[in-house]
Amino acid sequence: VARNSLKNVFRLIDSVQNQLPPEQDFLNDLKRSIEMTDEKNNRLPSKTYKPSGMNCIRQSYYQIIGIEPDKSSSSYTLVGICNSGTDIHIRIQTAVEQMKDNGMDCEYIDVSTFVNQRNLTDLEIVSKNGMETKLYHKKLNMSFMCDGIIRYKGKYYILELKTENSYKFMNRKDVDPSHYNQATAYSLAFGLDDVLFVYISRDVLDMKSFMFHVTDEMRENLKNYISECDSYVSNKIAPPKPESVERKTCNYCNYKSRCKKDK
């Protein structure tokens, strides 16, 4: 009986869809196509540390040992938000590159050139996509995308672009604490102390900038974080869930199911 009822529901859905006007039918297909393309592009994360995901040692542990993330499907709106963020990154990077042509004392530095000139042998250039460079730190087993390096008024800075909604942007007073470890990881990789954050409202495209200075203590703490996680990996024991981890870190975590099992 239950099976027949379910078949009837599917028939009803098909019937309704067949009765839709072509413009609505097209829109539904467009939305679904966006989601299907995103699902096809989903891949298992590499077994490396990611600077943007180093706010929970247990999360890092699961990634390093290759635990399959929770299955999830992004809505077409979320896919659009991510794509919009990528587009904004490209436009801002291009605008920064054009500053020199407009007579300003600012130069957008090619990351691969910077790595070679500074003889940063631990860094491997994995790929380049436009103005973004994907790198791998061999000693730390860390992979990341870099928005860029600039030389502004004679000093080098790591450039990090962040897009956010208008509510977060309006209340933005400083660098988000969840981005501290990411900035520290970049500093450790490039040997530069200062990370220039530019936060962009994805709604009205206004911008705010903040400087984050990385200290030797911060870099040492991050190296200790990696070393501690590596020891858990070697012993095949999941680290305790940090008590200080922020709620949003848990909310956006891709390993919630496994984390609950490990208690």
Mark where each language-model region is.
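Short acidic (Asp/Glu) and glycine-rich catalytic loops that position anionic groups and cofactors
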Residues: E68-K71, T163, R202-M207
